[in-house]
């Protein structure tokens, strides 16, 4: 039970309790959620979260839509290969200045250890990488290059 997250509802049968009430009580009193939400970290948590301990020499940055059309910029450690501790930062939106502000919460010594960052062709992503990771080499994502090449071949094929 210690290794895997469980819901309060799954405890109903074992302990003869109201699972929904238990979850509410846990959130309000036991978890420290209210204190965290009022802390310096919790104040900006709805806009961005940064995990400096997950940073590594090889990062990737991309935007994605998680829910309801909201775009997020996500910076991941490539060496973690999508497993635990792979997210370095997640920022609501793709505006360069907002993402740069969030990434600058990571100490510059850690950011300067990044040697390579993979990104797409977006100009805002280039600006983010240039400002937040000045010593990192920027590598264009293979998917975007393949798409450009296929589009060019398609144009030539149609023209002839």
Identify what each model region corresponds to.
Residues 7-27:
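Short, basic interhelical loop/turn and adjoining N-cap
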Residues 15, 26-37, 153-160:
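Short, well-ordered alpha-helical segments in soluble proteins
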Residues 1-6:
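Short, amphipathic alpha-helical "recognition" segments used to contact nucleic acids or chromatin
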Residues 120, 129-160:
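Conserved beta-strand -> loop -> alpha-helix junction used to position metal-binding or nucleic-acid-contacting
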Residues 11-12, 60, 118, 138-141:
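A structural signal for short, well-ordered beta-strand segments and their strand-loop junctions
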Residues 23-128:
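RNase H-like nuclease fold core
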Residues 18, 110-113, 135-136:
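Secondary-structure boundary/capping positions in well-ordered alpha/beta enzyme cores
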